[in-house]
Amino acid sequence: MQNFKTSCIECGGEVAIKKGTYRFRESGLDTVVLKGVEIVRCPACGDESPIIANLDGLLRTLALAIVTSKLPLTGPEVRYLRKYLGMSGDQFARMLHTDKSTLSKWETGAVNIGSKSDLLIRAVALHLGRGLRDEAEEAVRGFELIDEESANVPHRIEVDAATLTFAYS
């Protein structure tokens, strides 16, 4: 961990870098927390930003955490996987044999994602996602255990930024 000061890009004030926990809202998910990450913080304006050494690895780890979760996919998680795969709404909808309107309703939470569509989204992400297939083989066997009763139970994904491991809480 570096302990130096520099200027804030927002207000020009001095910033400090400290190791800590950071809610990774930039992912598009309110449920992701990075643990053990260096955070640049400006006391003057309150701006905070994480220092992420391996962004590709972090994004892959997050996709893996979503795909292997035993909880039904949420709309924001579907959006994250689509963007992780680099697909437009039209492309992803065609891949899932649905229309863009239905996909949009899933992503915004206006309509629940059915269990078969949930499994298809995970399978597509595993097939097309960089490096996901090999890492998730064991989890695929547990897909039939997805707990639809827990669909509305809030959960959080904690990602260790240094080891790129994750846990659900």
Which role does the model predict for each range below?
Residues M1-A65:
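N-terminal cysteine/histidine-rich coordination modules
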Residues L59-K83:
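A short, Lys/Arg-rich alpha-helix, primarily the initiator
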Residues L81, D90-R94, L103:
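Short alpha-helical "recognition helix" segments of helix-turn-helix
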Residues H97-I113, I121:
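Recognition helix of helix-turn-helix/homeodomain-like DNA-binding domains
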Residues T98, K116, V124, A167-S169:
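Non-heme di-metal
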Residues S115-D134:
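DNA major-groove recognition helix of helix-turn-helix/homeodomain DNA-binding modules
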Residues R133-S169:
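Helix-turn-helix/homeodomain-like alpha-helical modules used for DNA recognition
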